[in-house]
Each structure stands twice: as C-alpha cells, then as structure tokens.
C-alpha cells in the first residue's frame, strides 16, 4: 500500500517532456525571422531532464540551428554586395507583387533597397549552407572600362601635380613586363576597388548549443555592416562616382562592377590591374582596409577592401595629349619660344606728373592702334605727315611710315606746350606711347575767321601759331624740287593751297598743301615771318586744329611737335632720299588698304572743298575793300607800327594792314561786316602842315568836314557780309572791342543811311554822335571856361596797361539827356580825333589805347561837348598844337584824368554848365557801371600803351575807339 500512491510520479516528467520537445521544435523554425534567437531554450537552466534534452538535440534542434545559421551566412554576403554596389552604382529597385513600393532589405539593422539585378549573380551565396555547400569568397570589383572610348579619346590619369598620364599606355607597359595576368581582368580595364567577403574555414564541428550562439553572431554582424556602409562612402571611388554623376561625364568614366567567385587561396605573386602603377609617384598605388572578423559557429566572417589611392581620371583628346607631350608643356623640359616684348633699359622712365616721353620705335609699333573702331583703320606708328592727301599716300611698309626716332621731339614739344595753349594741344596730339595713344583727328572750324573771343591772349608769349614753334619752312622754290621722288597718287590730285580743292598735283617736294595761299593780293605772307605775324591766318593754318591733318607741313604733324628742330628735318629728308620706293603703290593689298584709309580723309577733303567758294568771295571782297580804301586815302599813309624792313608791310588781306603786326593780331577780316565796324586799321599820320586836324590824329573825317565835301570810301562801296549776331539777354552794352576798331574811318555825311545796318552791332553802330555846328560852338564855349578847373583837378597817377581809357564825347550828353529830355541836334558826319569814329560809346570810361594829346585835346576834350556845340578854327588849331606836343606819358595821364573827372563834366547841351551837385549825382552811376563790366574787358587791353611813338609824338597804339561800352540805356536815332 505504501508504493501505490507513488505510482503517478514518473508520468509527470514524461508529460512535461512533450511540450518541452514541441517548444524546441518551434524554435528550430524561428531563425527564418531575424528576431528568432531571443527565446531559445528557456527551460534549460533547471538542471532536470538531461536525458530527454540529449536525445532531442540529435534529432530536431540541430536542423533548426543549422537553418538559422544558413540564413545568416546567405544574408551576410548579399547584404555586403548591396551596400558596396549601391554606393558606387545606381541599381534598379525591386517591387513586391501588386505594390508600387520598393522592397527594402532590413537585415542586420541596415535598411537598403533590394534589387533583383544581383539575384542571379549572387545565387551561389544565396543557396550555400554551413556544412555541405560552403560559400566561396565573394569578390566585387569596381572598374573603368575603356572600350567605350573613340579613336581620338584617351583615358588619362592626373597625378598630384596635375600632370596627365595615359592609362592604357601604362597598362600596356605593365603587361609586357608581366605577361601573366589574373583571369578576372581584361586588358583594357582599370580596377578601382576590390572587395572580398569571405567565410573562413572551421576545424570544429557545430557546437551543441548552436541555437544559443546565433543571436550573438547576429548582433555582432550589425556592427560590421554599419561600419561597411559608412566606410564605403569615404573611399576615393565613391568621390569619383559622385563627381561624374553631377557632371554627366563621358560614358567611359562610369564605374562598372563585376562579382567574382574568389578562390580560397590568393596568389599575391601575380600582378593585376589594381596594383599596377599608372604613373610614377612616391605614394602608394593601393591600400587595403579590413573590417575585422566576426566569429560564428560556421567559421569567421571577414570583409576587406583594396582600393586605389588616386581615382582622378578624365578623358582627353588624343592629339592634344600628344602635342602637349611633344611641346613639353607638362614636364617643363622644353618651353615654346613665344615672342616676348623686351623693354629697353636705356630708355628713361617717364617723368612723374608729365606726359609720357617715350613712343614706340619704328620697328616696334603698337598693333592696337591700327583699329580705332569696327569700321576705321589707322596706320600703325607715327606717320610722315598728317595731311589727308599724304594719308592716302601712306601705303608703304609698316616700319618705314615714321621718319623719326622715338623721343626725338618730346622735350621740345613739352616746352612748347607749357608756353601756349595751341602748342599744348599739339603736344598732346603728337605724343604717343603704349599708355597714351592718340590719333590725328580731322576737324574744321565752322567759320573762316575765329570770333572776337578767339583772339590770342595778351599774357601769352609771342607764339602766334603752331607753325611758329619750329624752324623755318622750306622755301617754295626749294619745295618745288623736293617732291620729285614721290610717285603719283592713284587719284593724281592734292589739295589746292588756297581752297583745299583737289587739283592736278604740282611737282613740289616736301611742301605743305597750305604753306602759302594763292598768289593774289589777299594771300598770306610768302615767307614764314609774314605768315606768322599776319592776323588773317584763320583760313587754313589757324582754323585747323592741331593734329587735324589739314596742315601737311614738312616736319610732321601740326605744331611740329614730332620734329622740333632742323636736325630732325634734315634726317627726315635724308631718309626720304635713301628710300626712293617709300610710297610705291604696287600690289592689290596696298590699294585695298588705301581704299580703307580714304573713307575718313575723303570726307574731310570734300567738306573743306565746299568752303572754297566762300573763301574766294571773302578774298575778293577783302582785296576790293583794300584797293578802294587805299585809293581814297591819298595822303601817303605808311605802316607806322612796323619797322620798314619787316616782311608783311605789303598790303595783304591775310594781315590787317594798319595794325602793328604781331603774333597776337586778332583774326578780323578787313571788310565791313557785323563783326567789325571799322574796315581797315591804319596807324598813319599826315605829313602836311600842322594846322590840319588830320595832323594830330590823322582823321580823314576832319578833312572831309573842313572841306565840306563828301567822299565815298571803300567800306561804303563794298557790300557788307551779313554775319548774324547771337541773341543776347541784355542790350549789347558790354562788348569787346574789335581789332579793326583802331583805324580812322573816312565816312561821308550821308553814311547815316548805310551804317546803321552795315556797322557792327558789337561796336556800337547805334551810338553815333554827329554834332551839329551849334552844338560844337556851345561845347567850345564851355570848354574854354572849364579849362582852369580841370587842370587844377588833375593829379598824376600811374595807369595800368589795360585801363588806358579815353573819354568819348557823347556819353554824358546821352546819359544826362535821357533823364532831362534833351534831344540831340542835327547830326553832321564829323569827328574830333582818330580814335573817335562816327559812333561814340555811352560812357566815358571806355578803354582806349591812350590819348595822344593833352587833357583838352579833341580826343579828350570832346567828351564834354554836347551834340549841339560847334568847333571853331581857333579851337582846332589849339588842340592840334597840343596834340603835336603831347607825349605818351601825358596822354596816359590825361586819359586817366578824363576817366576820373568824367563825372564832373556836364554837357553843354542843357544850355550851360550844370551845378556841382548834379555833376556828383552821375559819378556813382558811372563808376558802378564800370565795375559791373570789368570782367568783359577786351583781350587787347594793356598792350598798346607801350607801342612805339610816331615821329610827331603820337602813340601808335592810341588809335583805339570807344568800342567797348559800359553803359546801358536806349538811344534813338537822331
């Protein structure tokens, strides 16, 4: 009875062993899932039922553990291949059935898109196991295939210095040295990397606790694949693949791969394309990185990579690579002999703050100067002449186009440029350097004579024209025989000297087209001195700007700034004699170059040709005006301001005949026009007796008045050129004086009908003071009574050169008469001095050139005469005697006293001497108007006070009429 209750005890462990075995059977199928190794053998730590466990291990647990181990081995290889190839190559994704979502491989806790492309290539590793079919080593090679290159393309490798190396040539050289090559590589592949994933051999049998070891193997593999995923993006091949993917490079640069079944035993003695050096370098060709070993019951898992340290490849042109090798551009063994500009060390550097002194030599011109724009072509280097005609001739060689050496005229040209504005412009036009490149321009003045404001300034040194800078020109006879060696131009025409119109070329050598004008009385001086000192050089020589090309002077461009001395001229002539064929027109290329250069110069010549008719009409008008004037003045007038031997005393319209000839003579034509009121200026004096009024001042008006006759003179007989004046904001009060306003006008009584229209508005044509006999008589009476008062008031004071004023007659009369209602009396064409013409300025402070007589001479004393006064013969004799004895200093002093005491001289037109209070009222107004117009003084002030005296004591520069007015107000014609 005791054993009966103990009978069911053995049945309990038996029943408990069944669920234990069934649970272990379920665990054998769990390795199909990555998380299956978590709950393996939960009841194994109890220490009981050891026999059933041992019997169960031999049956089912081994199969389940082996299945799990086989899954780990298979995914180990496939996952490594996906990570390596996805980082180098774009693999197409795979999709599940009925879904558009790409299938993702999540083994070893690394998510990556799965692909079906590698399924067949990795079939060997997908079907392997740990016991019977062990996997071979997985080898993945990435490489560049050169089969896609064309015949003119070459795969080159760049070293660390950027030098190009032919890859195929390096591979061929290595194959000759090592004919044996691995079977996996072809002859035209460049292997970049070689990956090796391998399961090592094991000598031990599978352990009994295989199920408990597999979760540890899985966890260790997660760390391996994460490091593989990261490190694969640090290698040079990945950088090379990404760069080509962005640039869309040549197809030959796309990385390709191949999966190779590796051999268990590597043969390192055989060279392969991975370890072949492509160029000489001190660095390693390849490097190897191992990811460590992961132990498993089936054997050690390992992964390593061998990669090229430099993957800088590109595809270049084969011919470019070959030529660079021949030229030695890469290895710097041979440098091409490219011409370099050598700077002459003997040439001094340019001065600081000045124009560049140096110019390019004849042999080394600047080619950049040849093309000024898209449509213009210019001759390179300095030209032999700036004339438009010689520009047509300049078809010679490049080196022979310049007659001078560099720097031959720089010093002297700059010295001239500092002296005068004209020379400065010429020096700027003539200087040439790589930094400052200037071309001669062709321009014309719109007028045949410059305006009055263009007269040379008195403060400039006597450099009248650009041509007066250099030495003398060749004389026309010499110049006529000098151009014989020049061949005829294609159009066989040069510019005419006077009208610039093309005509058949006269045989002359080295002569300027404008060196002298036509041989008529109106032409300029024959020699240089006369041409330089004439005031009418406005047509060809003065009107053209420096460097314009109109002045084809023998010594270079205008202003002679290229050749400034006779030595350079002689060298130029010698060079022309040596080079007889300098301007030969042989060859069609030279003719084509001429046609291109003719475009600018022909237009300039055509424009200047249209000025011929007006210039000829001007010359004829000037000639007739001169002849009529000289025939009317039959008192044997001579040029008093010029020495008798000075060239230029011959009458010429190019120079004002009566004015002292100087380089600063204003360019004013000697014909009546609206630019000048007095046609001809003549510093002459009559050599008759001293009782005539013309002896003191040479006034033909006094002769006409005393004789009572009427003479018709040249200016009134010639039709005036109607030159319109510019509109002005204010009345024409503050006008400059004209250079032609210094000659006594011989005007008849009936000029009243002509001169309001033919007289110059700028010289006050509306301000004529024609005094009647009654007015002159009353003026004489007041003059005799006021003599003592004005003499007591005179005090000598020095007078500046630009304030030698004369008191005009009608200023106070008009100024007071306009307020008091005094109407001028009948007009008579008479004047009282040579520098008081038919018109008179309004105020008495107009700037004259100085009075030749005393204070009460007719030139100064007439300022206090009213229009209704009369002049008696006694007064004329007394004033004439005083004028004959007056000196230059007295005239200056008296002229200044006239200006100072002008406010105290009342007009007799009011019936008698006014009170002193009324005299002082006008004085502030007169001086205020004088200060108001002080800025508009003439250019010619202050120059003529110091002129030479004539034999009777008169100052040559004192024939200055009151042509510049300083007062306002309207004056009605009387």
Curated annotation (Swiss-Prot):
Ranges annotated as biased composition (Basic residues): 834-848
Compositionally biased intervals (Polar residues): 373-388, 674-709
Annotated spans, Disordered: 1-60, 341-563, 629-712, 779-974
Any Pfam family the entry gives: ATG13
Keyword Cytoplasm: yes
One GO cellular component term: phagophore assembly site
Subcellular location as annotated: Cytoplasm; Preautophagosomal structure
Primary localisation category: cytoplasm
Alphabetic keyword roster: Autophagy, Cytoplasm, Protein transport, Transport
Mutant lacking the gene: phenotype: Decreases the level of autophagy. Still enables the autophagic process to proceedeto completion but limits the induction of autophagy.
Biased composition (Gly residues): 964-974
Compositional bias annotation for Basic and acidic residues: 357-367, 779-797, 937-950
InterPro entries: ATG13 (IPR040182), Atg13_N (IPR018731), HORMA_dom_sf (IPR036570)
Transport keyword on record: yes
Entry's Gene Ontology BP terms: autophagy; mitophagy; piecemeal microautophagy of the nucleus; protein localization to phagophore assembly site; protein secretion
Residue stretches of biased makeup (Low complexity): 12-22, 401-410, 450-470, 493-514, 535-544, 629-640, 854-870
Subunit structure: Interacts with atg1 to form the atg1-atg13 kinase complex.
Function: Plays a key role in autophagy. Activates the atg1 kinase in a nutritional condition dependent manner through the TOR pathway, leading to autophagy. Also involved in cytoplasm to vacuole transport (Cvt) and more specifically in Cvt vesicle formation. Seems to play a role in the switching machinery regulating the conversion between the Cvt pathway and autophagy. Finally, atg13 is also required for glycogen storage during stationary phase.
Family per record: Belongs to the ATG13 family. Fungi subfamily.
The protein's name: Autophagy-related protein 13
Lineage: Eukaryota, Fungi, Dikarya, Ascomycota, Pezizomycotina
The gene coding this protein: atg13
């Amino acid at each position: 009875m005791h054993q009966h209750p103990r009978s069911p005890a053995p049945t309990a462990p038996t029943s408990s062993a069944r669920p234990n075995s069934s649970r272990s059977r379920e665990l054998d199928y769990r390795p199909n899932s990555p998380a299956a190794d978590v709950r393996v053998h939960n009841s194994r730590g109890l220490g009981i039922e050891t026999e059933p466990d041992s019997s169960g291990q031999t049956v089912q647990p081994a199969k389940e553990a082996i299945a799990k181990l086989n899954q780990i081995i298979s995914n180990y290889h496939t996952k490594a291949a996906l990570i390596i190839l996805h980082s180098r190559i774009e693999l197409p994704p795979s999709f599940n059935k009925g879904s558009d979502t790409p299938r993702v491989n999540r083994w070893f806790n690394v998510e990556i898109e799965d692909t079906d492309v590698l399924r067949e290539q990795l079939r060997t590793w997908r079907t392997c196991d740990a016991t019977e079919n062990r996997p071979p080593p997985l080898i993945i090679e990435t490489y560049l295939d050169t089969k896609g290159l064309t015949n003119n393309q070459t795969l080159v490798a760049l070293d660390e210095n950027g030098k190009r190396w032919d890859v195929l040539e390096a591979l061929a050289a290595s194959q000759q040295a090592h004919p044996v090559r691995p079977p996996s590589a072809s002859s035209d592949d460049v292997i970049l990397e070689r990956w090796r994933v391998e399961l090592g051999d094991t000598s031990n049998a599978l352990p009994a606790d295989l199920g408990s070891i597999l979760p540890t193997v899985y966890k260790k593999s997660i760390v391996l694949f994460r490091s593989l995923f990261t490190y694969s993006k640090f290698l040079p091949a990945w950088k090379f693949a990404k760069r080509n993917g962005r640039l869309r490079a040549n197809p030959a640069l796309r990385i390709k791969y191949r999966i190779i079944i590796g051999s268990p035993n590597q043969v390192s003695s055989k060279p392969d394309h991975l370890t072949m050096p492509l160029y000489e370098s001190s660095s390693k060709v390849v490097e190897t990185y191992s990811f460590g070993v992961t132990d498993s019951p089936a054997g050690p898992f390992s992964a390593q990579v061998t990669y090229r340290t430099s993957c800088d490849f590109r595809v270049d042109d084969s011919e470019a690579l070959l030529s660079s090798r021949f030229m030695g551009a890469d290895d710097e063994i041979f440098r091409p002999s490219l011409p370099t500009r050598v700077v002459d060390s003997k040439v001094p550097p340019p001065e600081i703050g000045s124009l560049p002194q140096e110019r390019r030599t004849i042999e080394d011109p600047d080619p950049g100067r040849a093309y000024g724009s898209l449509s213009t072509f210019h001759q390179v280097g300095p030209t032999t002449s700036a004339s438009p005609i010689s520009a047509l001739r300049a078809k010679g060689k490049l080196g022979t186009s310049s007659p001078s050496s560099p720097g031959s005229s720089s010093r002297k040209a700059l010295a001239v440029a500092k002296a005068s504005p004209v020379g400065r412009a010429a020096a700027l036009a003539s200087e040439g350097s790589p930094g400052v490149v200037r071309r001669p321009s062709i321009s014309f003045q719109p007028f045949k004579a410059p305006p009055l404001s263009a007269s040379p300034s008195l403060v400039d040194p006597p450099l009248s024209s650009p041509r007066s800078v250099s030495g003398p020109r060749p004389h026309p006879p010499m110049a006529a025989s000098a151009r014989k060696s020049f061949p005829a131009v294609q159009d066989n025409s040069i510019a005419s000297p006077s009208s610039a119109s093309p005509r058949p070329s006269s045989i002359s050598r080295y002569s300027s087209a404008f060196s002298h004008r036509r041989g008529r009385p109106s032409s300029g001086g024959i020699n240089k001195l006369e041409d330089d000192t004439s005031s009418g050089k406005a047509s060809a020589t003065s009107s053209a700007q420096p460097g314009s090309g109109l002045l084809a002077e023998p010594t270079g461009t205008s202003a002679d700034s290229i050749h400034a001395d006779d030595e350079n001229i002689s060298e130029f002539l010698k060079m022309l004699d040596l080079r007889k064929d300098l301007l030969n027109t042989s060859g069609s290329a030279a003719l084509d170059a001429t046609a291109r250069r003719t475009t600018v110069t022909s237009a300039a010549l055509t424009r200047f040709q249209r000025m011929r008719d007006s210039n000829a009409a001007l010359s004829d008008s000037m000639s007739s005006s001169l002849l009529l004037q000289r025939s009317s003045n039959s008192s044997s007038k001579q040029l008093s301001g010029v020495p008798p031997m000075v060239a230029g005393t011959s009458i010429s319209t190019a120079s004002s005949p009566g004015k002292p000839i100087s380089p600063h003579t204003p360019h004013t034509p000697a014909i009546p026009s609206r630019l000048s009121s007095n046609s001809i200026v003549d510093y002459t004096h009559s050599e008759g007796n001293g009782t005539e009024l013309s002896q003191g001042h040479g006034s033909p008006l006094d002769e006409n008045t005393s004789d009572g006759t009427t003479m018709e003179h040249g200016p009134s007989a010639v039709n005036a050129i109607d030159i319109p004046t510019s509109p002005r904001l204010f009345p024409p009060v503050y006008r400059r004086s004209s250079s032609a306003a210094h000659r006594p006008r011989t005007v008849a009584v009936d000029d009243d009908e002509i001169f309001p229209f033919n007289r110059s508005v700028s010289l006050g044509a509306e301000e004529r003071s024609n005094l009647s006999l009654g007015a002159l008589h009353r003026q004489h009476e007041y003059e005799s009574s006021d003599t003592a008062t004005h003499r007591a008031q005179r005090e000598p004071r020095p007078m500046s050169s630009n304030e030698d004023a004369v008191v005009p007659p009608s200023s106070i009369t008009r100024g007071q008469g306009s307020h008091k209602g005094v109407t001028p009396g009948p007009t008579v064409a008479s004047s009282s001095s040579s520098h008081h013409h038919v018109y008179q300025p309004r105020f008495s402070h107009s700037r004259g050139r100085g009075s030749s007589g005393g204070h009460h001479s007719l030139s100064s004393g007439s300022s206090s005469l009213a229009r209704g006064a009369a002049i008696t013969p006694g007064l004329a004799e007394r004033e004439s005697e005083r004028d004959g004895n007056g000196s230059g200093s007295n005239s200056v002093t008296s002229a200044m006293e006239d200006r100072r005491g002008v406010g105290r001289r009342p007009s007799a037109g009011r019936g008698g001497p006014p009170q002193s209070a009324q005299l002082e009222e006008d004085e502030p107004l007169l001086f205020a108007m004088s200060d108001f117009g002080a800025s508009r003084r003439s250019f010619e002030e202050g120059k003529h006070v110091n002129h030479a005296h004539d034999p009777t004591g008169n100052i040559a520069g004192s024939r200055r009429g009151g042509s510049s007015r300083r007062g306002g107000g309207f004056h009605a014609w009387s």
